[in-house]
Amino acid sequence: MTVDNLQERTGAVTFKGQPITLLGPEPRIGDPAPEFSLTTGDLSNVTREILLDEGRRAALLIAVPSLDTPVCSLESQKFNQRLGEIPGDVAVAVVSMDLPFAQARWCAAQGDVKLQMLSDYRDHSFGLNYGLMIRELGFLARAVIIVAKDGTISYVEIVPEIAAEPDYDRALQAAAAVA
């Protein structure tokens, strides 16, 4: 991971009460959603254009540090259970630094998972371009980002404490609004 010339934001989030540093620009509502290349369970790449189906659908991107932690697992389960609250065509993806094989194991253990699992392990483009890469830990910060069909960011929640959960109701309402 190359981190030269990246913006650093210290104190935007904490880990167990201690300030940590996020790398990359802060995502802002109304800005064009940055590009990314993420890896699926079959090791193929998914880009922003593919996820948005070239402007035919919006995307709800759920960034978690690791599915192997209780809070990340619970968060992913809750979003999976509440997918029906989003009308229309919205791609819903959990993005983590976990290897695709670990993501597949998590899905197998859960059973009926409708979320798309995407890994940022290869080049960290999602974490760095969306300002969610934690310098000290090499994980993604916990965040929910919604990209509208036109490719702009329409919702951002970067959870202030890594061990806390996001606001599910607000995120799902925002996703429904862009569906």
Where are these regions (language model features)?
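Chalcogenol-based redox active-site neighborhoods
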Residues: 1-179
